A protein has these predicted regions:
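Short, aromatic-rich membrane-interface segments at the entry and exit
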Residues: 41-48, 65-68
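Alpha-helical transmembrane segments and their membrane-interface exit regions
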Residues: 51-61, 76-79
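Loop-to-transmembrane-helix entry motif
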Residues: 69-77, 113, 117, 207, ...
Length: 271
């Protein structure tokens, strides 16, 4: 399950989405995430899902690879679903002892789960189709106006990219530690959910040690290559908007306008 996390990974390719400017994908992803928290009806989620699957088709990233990332957060999605299902008051659909399911709770639980799925897939598409170097350059370019007020845009962009890239690295390291512990007789599968959580505690110390070791190796490698911050650095491949980026922005504007109209005039609310 841990190795199934796709957020932070890059899937090599030469699709239309891969060739888009990193800034275009970052801005589109941010607006997409904001829109997901604004949309409030079934048609909005349906249109969002259709647009997302169109982007996936254009990216040529296998659906199996993308949906694999959902298995790692299945428990979070399931917990959110159950929490909304039983904790929201409203018109009662089913009642047994202290458990009550309402129409409003069922609706909110379903759409909250859909929202989480769309958030995870949409965020993964950005990292799967953008090289870490391009992601760093894009973030730095977007944050560069704030450098006039003393904000270290290059350092912040680099930290965010490294943190994002380290997610699959740490998950892979966790998987190795679990297998090593199991080879020594450790049991992480038996018991209830609380017992399983307690069984994971011994993994924290070796995981932290491994994380610090990898961070130290990365720092030494950057220092050996003469890294001294963003000041005075040039780019081998400077970011430049192309015709496809302008088309992508136009499609994004049409999508946002459509979502605004759907959310405003189609009053089939999900909560």
């Amino acid at each position: 399950m841990i190795r199934d996390i796709t957020l932070g990974q890059y899937y090599p390719g030469d699709s239309w989405v891969h060739r888009l400017d990193a800034r275009t994908k970052i801005i589109a992803t941010l607006l997409y995430l904001i829109e997901l928290f604004v949309v409030n009806n079934f048609y909005g989620f349906l249109i969002t899902a259709a647009v997302l699957f169109a982007v996936i088709a254009l990216s040529k990233v296998p659906l199996k690879f993308i949906f694999r990332g959902l298995t790692a957060v299945f428990l979070i999605i399931a917990f959110t679903f159950l929490l909304n299902l039983f904790m929201v008051d409203g018109r009662v659909l089913w009642h047994w002892k202290f458990l009550t399911i309402t129409y409003e709770g069922l609706s909110r639980a379903f759409f909250m789960a859909i929202r989480l799925v769309l958030i995870i897939i949409g965020s993964s598409i950005m990292t799967l189709t953008t090289k870490p170097v391009e992601l760093t350059d894009g973030l730095e370019k977007l944050l560069s106006p704030f450098s006039k007020i003393g904000l270290p845009s290059h350092e912040i962009a680099l930290m965010m990219t490294i943190a994002l890239r380290f997610i699959p690295t740490l998950m892979e390291e966790t998987d190795k530690i679990i297998k090593a512990q199991q080879a020594r007789g450790a049991d992480f599968e038996s018991g209830n959910l609380i017992q399983k959580a307690k069984n994971m505690v011994p993994l924290l110390v070796p995981l932290f040690i491994s994380a610090f070791r990898r961070a130290n190796d990365l720092a030494m490698a950057m220092e050996a290559r003469g890294y001294h911050g963003g000041e005075g650095r040039t780019k081998m491949h400077p970011l430049e908007y192309k015709k496809t980026d302008k088309i992508a922005y136009l499609v994004l504007l049409v999508y946002l306008a459509l979502m605004f109209l759907v959310s405003r005039y189609m009053k089939i609310e999900t909560w």
